[in-house]
Structure formats: C-alpha cells, structure tokens
Swiss-Prot record:
It is found in: Cytoplasm. It catalyses: N-acetyl-L-glutamate 5-semialdehyde + phosphate + NADP(+) = N-acetyl-L-glutamyl 5-phosphate + NADPH + H(+). Gene3D superfamilies: Dihydrodipicolinate Reductase, domain 2 (3.30.360.10), NAD(P)-binding Rossmann-like Domain (3.40.50.720). This is N-acetyl-gamma-glutamyl-phosphate reductase. SUPFAM superfamilies: Glyceraldehyde-3-phosphate dehydrogenase-like, C-terminal domain (SSF55347), NAD(P)-binding Rossmann-fold domains (SSF51735). It comes from Bordetella petrii (strain ATCC BAA-461 / DSM 12804 / CCUG 43448). One of its GO terms (biological process) is L-arginine biosynthetic process.
Length: 354
C-alpha cells in the first residue's frame, strides 16, 4: 500500500484490547496525520471500542472486528499489539500488499532465530523477514528505522537499559568494564499485560514488591544482543527485574565499573552531549533523582548520572512510562520516522501530575 506524504496514514491495530493496544488507540486518536481504519479482536468482534474503553468516547468511533473482516492489507501500516507469534504469521501477506509492520511483541526483536526459539518456545515463521527487520530503538537506529518495512518494537526493560548504557559503549568507547554490568529494574504491573494472572491480582500486587525472572527473563537476550552490537563484542550483564505496586512506570538503576584509564571522564557531559538532540531523552542535571511520576503518560525518558563520592562506580538512573516510551509511544515514534513525519508528531503529551 503506497502512501502519499500529503495524505493521512491509514493505520490498523491487531490486538486492540490489551494495555498496549488501548495505549496505541489513545495516542493515534490524537495524531494529526493518522486515520484509524481497523482494530481487531476475535473475542470482541462487533463491540464498539468506546464501550470497552470509555476514555475513547468521542475519539474512536470504530468497532472491533476480526482480522478477516478488517482488510488489513489496505492499511499503510499495521501495529501488532498481540502475543508473540501472531505478527510473523501474517507478515508475508501484509508485506506483499505493501503494508508496513510494527510489532510490539518479540517476533522481530531478536535477530538470531535459535535464540528466539529457545526463549519463546516456538519456531520462527519467517526468518527471511526477520533478517530484514529493524530493531526499533530510534535513538540508536534512526536511519535504519526510516527505511524499514518491518519494525521489532523494543521491550520495555531493554529500552531503559540500552539508552541508559549506550553512551558508555558505543563508537568503541572503553569507559567501563563491559563484563560486570548490572541492570536493577522495576516495573509497574501494567507491564504484565491485561490477562488474568494471579501475580497481578490486586491482593497479590498491592502493598508488595518482588523480584522475578532472576534465573532468566526473555528481555535478557534482547538486551545482551543489542549491547554487544554497541560494544562490538561480548558483554556480561546481570539483569534483575522487579514488580512494584503501581500501574504505570519503570525505574532502572544501572551500575557500571569505570575503567582506570577513564576515571577522569566527565560522564555528565558525555550523556548531555550524546542526547542533546534527542527530543524524548532528558538528561537531568547532575545530582538529580528522577521520579516515575514525571513521565507518566508521556513518551519521555529521563536519565540521571551519579558517581558516588567521585569513585569508580557509575550509577545511571533511567525512568519511563512502560506503556508509552516502553511500548506504544515508541511504536508511534517509529511510525513517524518510517513515514517521514516529525518524530514528535502525536507524542508531545506532557506527563500527568499528581
């Protein structure tokens, strides 16, 4: 499906009933260059979207439909806010029709098919399409994203870890010990999705704080693969995710040991220079302590750099809204770049406080 730059982008969403799906609807319904044409859900076929999500009353007039009824091949781009495995099953047909794909699941995140199959317990349906897909972290892959037909939208934890560590590793930087990196990450419960699950029941998640996936989490290989691309070699990463009793928000505390020859580096200046031209990345003043509420419902990601007592340990604090910059907002940012629009189109919402 060819797209004329002076017309609105025809957008379809597969899997519009989960949290990332409704977040896509919220953002795209306000986008000045988008026409929402299809939102699919087999279970809710025929139900008006606004009946399920009353925050969209007056904004989205569509009803959910099955993928067969939705004519997705008539769209310029289709977002998949679905479980792993769905996008790759439909990718060939959509690409043949000229429709571009942005997958918010993991089908096109990991370039190594064996790694994908080991962690997601399914064969990859289209290794040829995977080979041409682009990892959609705009701040690291801007040029490739702009030319892509298929985007693997990054996971929420990887977004914070990669953007938090990139200035220390990219372009041959030899600033920190790449074998002892630590990512201590916390997420609100919306990151687990909308499915019924005991661990995210109110009585389980409220007034509670716990680690999970310590022995192995699916985002670990994704983070490692991208860090190794940045560093140009193997990295050692300890990644520990936690669930905290809030709905939205992610806070990642990253630890890196400074190499002896880099002890004189001004790391605050390094980060400020690296992200000076990035619309959504805010490097906070030295000594800052970011709070997740400062990015709630926005596409901003904030970074604070700390070096306790001027020693050899660098601590990088990173916050984002896991549903926006960590998922749907980042997907829209990718779409904007793919269609030659300003990256901030439809994404300049100010965070909500309190």
């Amino acid at each position: 499906m060819a797209h004329a730059s002076n017309s609105r982008i025809k957008v379809g969403i597969v899997g519009g009933t989960g949290y990332t799906g409704v977040e896509l609807l919220r953002l795209l319904s306000q986008h000045p260059h988008v026409e929402l044409t299809a939102i699919t859900s087999r279970k809710e076929d025929g139900l008006p979207v606004a009946d399920m999500y009353p925050n969209l009353r007056g904004r989205v007039s569509l009803a959910f439909s099955t993928p067969e009824k939705a004519n997705l091949a008539d769209c310029d781009v289709v977002f998949f806010a679905t479980p792993h495995g769905v996008a790759m099953a439909q990718a060939q047909e959509l690409l043949a029709a000229g429709t571009r794909i942005i997958d918010l699941a993991a089908d096109f995140r990991l370039q190594d098919t064996a790694t994908f199959e080991r962690w997601y317990k399914m064969p990859h349906a289209c290794p040829d399409i995977l080979a041409e897909s682009v990892y959609g972290l705009v701040e690291l892959n801007r040029e490739a994203v702009s030319k892509a037909r298929v985007i693997g939208n990054p996971g929420c934890y990887p977004t914070t870890v990669l953007l938090g560590l990139a200035p220390l590793l990219e372009n041959g930087a030899a600033l920190v010990d790449t074998q002892t990196l630590i990512a201590d990450c916390k997420s609100g419960v919306s990151g687990a999705g909308r499915k019924a699950e005991v661990s995210t029941l109110f009585s389980e998640a409220s007034d509670n704080f716990k680690a999970y996936g310590v022995a192995g989490h699916r985002h670990h290989p994704e983070i490692s693969e991208q860090l190794e691309k940045l560093a140009g070699g193997k990295v050692g990463l300890t990644f520990v995710p936690h669930l905290v009793p809030m709905i939205r928000g992610m806070f990642s505390t990253l630890y890196a040991r400074i190499r002896p020859e880099a002890l004189g580096t001004d790391f605050q200046a390094l980060y400020e220079k690296r992200y000076a031209d990035e619309h959504f990345i805010d490097v906070m003043p030295a000594g800052s302590l970011p709070e997740t509420r400062s990015v709630r419902a926005s596409n901003n990601l904030r970074i604070a750099v700390q070096r306790p007592n001027g020693g050899d340990l660098l601590i990088v604090l990173v916050i984002q809204d896991n549903l926006v910059k960590g998922a749907s907002g980042q997907a829209v940012q990718n779409m904007n770049l793919m269609f030659g629009l300003p990256e901030s189109a439809g994404l300049d919402q100010v965070a909500i406080l309190p």
